[in-house]
Amino acid sequence: MQGYCLDFWRSGNWLGLVPAALLVLITAASAGRAVIVEDWTANRVGQRGIPSGWTGEGFGRRADYDFTIEQAGEVRMLHLQSQNEHSTIVKDITGKVVLKETPILEWSWKASVLPKGGDVRRKETTDIAAQLYIVWPRFPALLRSRIIGYVWDATTPVSTVVRSQKTGTVTFIVLRSGSKDLGKWLTERRNVVEDYRDLFGEFPENPTAITISIDSNDTQSAAESFIGPIIFREK
């Protein structure tokens, strides 16, 4: 079996599986009203560092931004790698997403390496390979902003909802956990309005930013993930 898997990998046949998984998302979005907030096509394949249209958020920590734009078939993606550091990028979506019209957030992602011992329930181990955040800034930002983070954690069980132990403005929703689906492209679909209501008890305003992160500094380990198109669409 090991030899077969190695031959399959070397053959390049696995490349055909990636666009199929990602194109499902693009096709679904085109079927109804949709807002594609990122599909990575504004960046050239092989481009490294912070992608066009995004800004880096260092939070006073080491941030390598070891990001690369890659392409499989017709679909582009962001490849994220982290080695004992924390990298976060933010994109302004002010005025682009109206949740009353497009409340469903869809995206595709893959985790390849999970930070060793990462656990969002503990401040000292809050390292995550794949993270996508929706941001509602409120003044003062550090105290009152509301941020929902959809994450692939190393150890925390799926469906766990937990407030960040580092900042009270972030609430994690664990969608994937552990190595069960490691190396697989998965498509996620979340009703942001329902998630917000469940957490805060009211209908949300329209979000003004999305954030992507990868970190491995707390556990002094490594992490790797990929993220494809990010889309808001109608129900």
Feature locations, PLM:
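A carbohydrate-recognition surface predominantly in extracellular/luminal proteins
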Residues: 100-112
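Secreted extracellular polysaccharide-interacting domains
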Residues: 79-101, 116-117, 169-175
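Extracellular ligand-binding interfaces
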Residues: 112-181, 223-226, 231-233
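Bacterial N-terminal signal peptides
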Residues: 16-27
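Extracellular carbohydrate-recognition regions
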Residues: 32-58
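Extracellular beta-strand elements of beta-rich domains used
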Residues: 40, 210, 229-232
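Extracellular beta-strand ligand-recognition surfaces/modules
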Residues: 127-132, 168-178, 182-221
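Short carbohydrate-recognition loop motifs
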Residues: 65-87
